[in-house]
A protein has these predicted regions:
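Bacterial Sec-dependent N-terminal signal peptides
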Residues: 1-38, 237
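Residues that define the transmembrane beta-barrel architecture of outer-membrane proteins
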Residues: 32-38, 70-72, 105-109, 145-153, ...
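Outer-envelope beta-barrel architecture signal
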Residues: 34-36, 50-54, 83-87, 121-127, ...
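Transmembrane beta-strands of outer-membrane beta-barrel pores
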Residues: 44-46, 58-64, 80-84, 91-97, ...
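Outer-membrane beta-barrel transmembrane domain signature
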Residues: 122-124, 128-217, 237
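Residues on the lipid-exposed face of transmembrane beta-strands in outer-membrane beta-barrel proteins
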Residues: 40-44, 76-80, 111-115, 131, ...
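Short glycine/proline- and aromatic-enriched beta-strand/turn motifs that initiate or cap beta-hairpins
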Residues: 31-73
C-alpha cells in the first residue's frame, strides 16, 4: 500500500511538471497570436455549511486587441450540496464598454448541476452542465434589447499536489463547450470551445488564490473561427 501511494505521488509530480511546461508554451504563443484578455475576480463566501453555500463575486475583464473593451461585473450564486451532486443558481450582471464598441448592459440568470467523481489518489473528475439566460440592453440610440439562452458543458480534473503543510495546491485542467443558435449582433464571443488550466493555492485560513490560462476557440457573426487567450487571477475568502 505504501509503495502504491508513493507511485501515485510521483505520477502527480510528473503531471504537474507537464502541465506547467504546457502552460508556459501556450502563454508564449498567445502573445503573438489572435486576441489577448485578462480577468480579475474577487470572491466572498457569504455563507457555507454542509448543505448550502452562498457566494458573492466582483470581476473585471479586459480585451487588449482593437477594438478593445472593458467589462465590470458582479454576481451572486447559491449552491445546494448533495454528496457528489451540487445544484446551483445565480445572477450575473455586466457592463461592457469602450469608445469604439456598442456599450451594453447584460443580466444573466443561470442554473447548473455539477457532479464530482473521485477517481484515484484524491484526483476528482468534475462535470458541470449549465444553462444561461442572457439579456442585453444597449446604450446607443436607438436603444435595443436582445436575449437568448446558452448551454455550457464543462469537464475537468481536480489534481491535489501532496504537501506536508496545511496549505496546499490543486491543479485543474478542463475543457468547456458553449452551444447557441442565434447570438446577439453586438455579442462577439457567444459560441466557444475552451481549454483551460488553473492552479489553486489554498491557505491555512481556507482563503484561495487562483491563477489560470484559457485558450478559446470561438465563432461569431463576422468570422468563421478565431482564437482568444485569457489570463485569470482570482482570490476567494
Amino acid at each position: 500500500m505504501i509503495n502504491l501511494i508513493v507511485f501515485f505521488k510521483e505520477k502527480k509530480r510528473h503531471l504537474l511538471k507537464f502541465l506547467v511546461l504546457l502552460f508556459i508554451s501556450i502563454s508564449h504563443h498567445a502573445y503573438s497570436q489572435h486576441e489577448f484578455f485578462h480577468e480579475l475576480v474577487l470572491e466572498k463566501k457569504l455563507m457555507e455549511n454542509e448543505k448550502w453555500e452562498l457566494i458573492g463575486e466582483a470581476n473585471f475583464k479586459h480585451l487588449y486587441n482593437e477594438p478593445a473593451w472593458r467589462r465590470w461585473g458582479a454576481s451572486f450564486a447559491g449552491a445546494r450540496k448533495m454528496n457528489r451532486f451540487s445544484l446551483f443558481g445565480g445572477l450575473n450582471g455586466y457592463y461592457t464598454f469602450n469608445r469604439n464598441i456598442t456599450n451594453f448592459f447584460e443580466m444573466r440568470p443561470w442554473t447548473a448541476v455539477q457532479f464530482k467523481l473521485p477517481i484515484v489518489a484524491k484526483i476528482v473528475l468534475r462535470q458541470q452542465l449549465k444553462y444561461e439566460w442572457r439579456f442585453f440592453y444597449t446604450e446607443e440610440q436607438p436603444k435595443t434589447k436582445e436575449n437568448y439562452g446558452r448551454l455550457r458543458y464543462q469537464v475537468g480534473l481536480d489534481i491535489p499536489i501532496p504537501a506536508k503543510e496545511e496549505s496546499s495546491w490543486t491543479i485543474r485542467p478542463y475543457f468547456e463547450w458553449f452551444f447557441i443558435k442565434d447570438p446577439a449582433e453586438f455579442e462577439r464571443f457567444s459560441n466557444e470551445r475552451d481549454f483551460g488550466l488553473m492552479a489553486i493555492k489554498r491557505f491555512k485560513n481556507e482563503h484561495k488564490l487562483s491563477f489560470g490560462f484559457t485558450r478559446e476557440v470561438y465563432y461569431d457573426l463576422f468570422a468563421e473561427r478565431e482564437y482568444g487567450y485569457l489570463f485569470f487571477v482570482g482570490y476567494s475568502f
